[in-house]
Amino acid sequence: MEESQNGVKYGGDATDAKEYFTIQPRSLQNCDLKDIERKTKFAHLQNYRTNYPEMGMCLIINNKNFHSSNMAVRNGTDVDALKLHETFTGLGYEVMVCNDQKSSDIIGRLKKISEEDHSKRSSFVCAILSHGEEDGSICGVDVPIHIKNLTDLFRGDRCKTLVGKPKIFFIQACRGTELDSGIETDSCSEPREEIQRIPVEADFLYAYSTVPGYCSWRDKMDGSWFIQSLCKMIKLYGSHLELIQILTCVNHMVALDFETFHAKKQIPCVVSMLTKSFYFFK
């Protein structure tokens, strides 16, 4: 239903919930403190390589209509998908948008991409726009699927050509049914070369539109707070800030610049297993 304020009509806000004993590491054995300090002194300055021939694939799963499951239509999601397509095309990604996907379709598309040769690509990006559940599932247009079933396809032991490269997932979906009422605040304004083994769960980043247990807001005309803020911050800062800094700006924008007519708030949640800084430019 449209809402109005001071005579101006708005598309209204909606949510994306589904209705309603240790061994000393070998690297430290026979290693003195100075050696450790030498190895780690400049670790925080290391960046992921982006000078590959291609930036990589960007898959956008845009689920709007849920006819078989009786969940609400996600009006405004097409605005998000279009903005994401524009943003990541501008960054040099090969973008694929898939609309109204069943859970089996989502798994199939991601499995196919995980089996591709990514040797000439710097990263992989996936954005999922859908309803979500409190247990961490996202919804196909038919049934839910846990996000881990999707991201596990890109683990280092399964997708060899993306080992050591960023695998970035943006999730626009509710993670529960709680509503955030907010609170007022008082405020003023060189290591030697060696072969390394990488944990299979390394180099993933998950950027969720909201924290566990809470709803995620989407304007029915303008798109979701999270995706619109993400695209805006990438446009403003993607040419000089690294990804975590950009996502911090996204958190700031969503937390402070948005509010529903009923004074409800939202804060995105970033879970990072990245091991270096990632920039969207070469």
Curated annotation (Swiss-Prot):
Entry EC no(s): 3.4.22.56
GO CC annotation terms, alphabetical: cytoplasm; death-inducing signaling complex
Gene Ontology MF terms: cysteine-type endopeptidase activity; endopeptidase activity; enzyme activator activity
Cited InterPro entries: Caspase-like_dom_sf, Caspase_cys_AS, Caspase_his_AS, Pept_C14, Pept_C14_caspase, Pept_C14_p10, Pept_C14_p20, Pept_C14A
One Pfam family of this chain: Peptidase_C14
Localisation: Cytoplasm
GO biological processes: apoptotic process; erythrocyte differentiation; execution phase of apoptosis; keratinocyte differentiation; neuron differentiation; positive regulation of neuron apoptotic process; proteolysis
Annotated active site: H131, C174
PROSITE patterns: CASPASE_CYS, CASPASE_HIS, CASPASE_P10, CASPASE_P20
Note: The subunits are derived from the precursor sequence by a probable autocatalytic mechanism and probably by other caspases.
Protein name in UniProt: Caspase-3
Species the sequence originates in: Xenopus laevis (African clawed frog)
Lineage, highest ranks first: Eukaryota, Metazoa, Chordata, Craniata, Vertebrata
